[in-house]
Curated annotation (Swiss-Prot):
Keywords: Aminoacyl-tRNA synthetase, ATP-binding, Cytoplasm, Ligase, Nucleotide-binding, Protein biosynthesis. Coiled coil: none annotated. ATP binds at residue 622. GO terms for cellular component: cytosol. This is Leucine--tRNA ligase.
Amino acid sequence: MQELYRPEEIESTVQQHWHENDTFKVTEDPCKEKYYCLSMLPYPSGRLHMGHVRNYTIGDVIARYQRMLGKNVLQPIGWDAFGLPAEGAAVKNNTAPAPWTYANIDYMKNQLKLLGFGYDWSREVTTCRPDYYRWEQWFFTRLYEKGLVYKKTSAVNWCPQDQTVLANEQVIDGCCWRCDTKVERKEIPQWFVKITAYADQLLYDLDKLESWPEQVKTMQRNWIGRSEGVEITFQVADSEETLTVYTTRPDTFMGTTYVAVAAGHPLSLQAAASNPALADFIQECRTTKVAEADMATMEKKGMATGLHAVHPLTGEMLPVWVANFVLMDYGTGAVMAVPGHDQRDFEFARKYDLPVKPVIRNADGSEPDLSAQAMTEKGVLFNSGEFDGLDFQAGFNAIADALVAQGVGERKVNYRLRDWGVSRQRYWGAPIPMMTLEDGTVVPTPEDQLPVVLPEDVVMDGISSPLKADPDWAKTTYNGQPALRETDTFDTFMESSWYYARYTCPDYDRGMLDPAAANYWLPVDQYIGGIEHAIMHLMYFRFYHKLLRDAGLVTSDEPAKRLLCQGMVLADAFYYLTSSGERVWVSPLEVSVERDEKGRIVKSTDASGRELVYAGMSKMSKSKNNGIDPQEMVEKYGADTVRLFMMFASPAEMTLEWQESGVEGANRFLKRVWKLAYEHPQQGPVGALDIDALNDEQKALRREVHKTIAKVTDDIGRRQTFNTAIAAIMELMNKLARAPQQTGQDRALLQEALVAVVRMLYPFTPHACFTLWRALGGEGDIDNAPWPVADEAAMVEDAKLVVIQVNGKLRGRITVPADADEALVCERASQEHLVAKHLEGTTVRKVIYVPGKLLNLVVG
């Protein structure tokens, strides 16, 4: 072992050892408890960023810890390799998406290896390869045969920039999540998977996920949006037509004053045929923002159709309006408007001078004041004829029953969740395995024609998909008949919804999954990824697992037992303004800063001396040029230092503020550990530790060692507070550095302590600990060493420090035997000079004793 800590030499040597020995390669072993630790697979964008490093370091720490507990640990990695960015990069770099993607994978794979992550690389999965997506295509055809897949023309979120459909979840503030272009509404044929058929399971099984963050479960519950209500049919006056609405507030039904329908509703289109102004308004609605946040805040617009609906209980004639806040995709595309008790309906009614009728009293029994806003609380009905005086639940039931009895109502459970649109009008994705025959019949691609292989040698023009531009690619046959292949490709969430299961059997070629391997490893024991995936990936991930279960491929109900959502990585951001007012962002690595006495940045300049504006800490991003390249940090400080800083600087689920001074601090700590572990063996052989021969000082130090082991074990295993685990190890190291080394028992105790420190640090800093383990005489490789176990006997304290109070005020501290009872503590306390002084001439009225901690004497 060398005297100085040189990570550049140590880390490459240790990584080579892991590679040559297949250290992290695993197979199913029924005799060992399994543990499947998985971080969300990366998109191969070209380079790792610090968000990746944080995610994968957390996963690696957990995996190595569980391995030291003796478990059979699977930690795989792969590549979510399809996706739109590859198309843009291919056009920009005059290449095709495939070579760009494969080159990125090679580069990023090397970066992952340099960080020392303990992956089983034999299970690497690349989702753009036909041997992966063939099974996705096969499964899709099975879902089609089961009636869980269908095609329909529907209004979709269309990104004109990317020329593709976006899921509702991919529309952020009315714009495309990827390119920030304003989203339009467009009617095109789409393939859908019936996630709504599993809505109840997805909702109720959230209760089984005891080790998932409540925030994620709440977001999923809200997204599924189960509601109980009534579907009501209105007759259109002077017509055979009807329209249907769904409401969760039938108790307010007698307050309905108009009906609003979506621009795409059949009644809207019928009325527009003879009304050019209405036709123009409907066209305007097609570009309306569709994200819910926008729907809530945008200006409410509408136009009367001239039609009227007949109120089924009162016979009142209710005007039918087209409104921009009603969407065909939600419910029935029509809503009953109760402006007295719904704020959106109220705003619309005020704008267009429509009647407002109150039908629910205030909590105090008074009539609501509707001059400024709607009264949306539940209460007792009035102005409602025979239903007057009923409370919410009674009113709900009575009006629902009346509608059902008349044949114009039906109690229904509705969901906010919509079926999953999986069609994308792009090239770089898995081809959808469906065909259209000459007579228009749509059929699934036969199994013997799978996979439908995506051609990789293509020329990108940046506008149309090569699949759509090449008519020959689509031509095929079905049972000897000419047929055309589907030229849409799958949403890339399809690939990332089942990759975790394929890791259990990546080379299996007789089916989608090897049931024996899949059911040995699944469910995932620990899943790690960002909270931003709560309602897209994590919902589809759960849905797909239930589909796999119902196909007989897995036996568990949920894909992952425990979920950890790591926080974002932030860094300082700086910019200057050009003469035109444009912000130019400058990398923090190129900025010199001055700080005040509290460490706050008060001045910043770039290399040319230009003064910059400090924009605070923000998420590392290309747009703000404040990303820190992990590779540069690894080359400067070593992978172990970067890993240690990432785990120490913040609780895992909180945001992490990147500070290079913190990285330097982590590096100094590792050097201290290295120095002590180097110097210790240099002093000669170490004898056996004789626990019975330890003096009080040695016992106290050994107690600290084993209390630290207990704390670190709990922090990593149960609490997952990795930063406090590291802090405890650092605190112990400070004590070890000051510990005497005069006797054989001093040295034997330090040996036990250092070996424990190295084992506890191993999940965080595996390269250094691999080397130190050998230097300290550890048996075999530390990769196969057991986790240290705290000695309960060592943690028992011989004595306790008890705080003494008189009438709640501190009057002294005394040391008593650990097993001292209240009487002994009172006796010792009364002998303390300051305590005795405050007891003089008084009577002890009450004794409050917290064993081993505090004695409070209440006197009078």
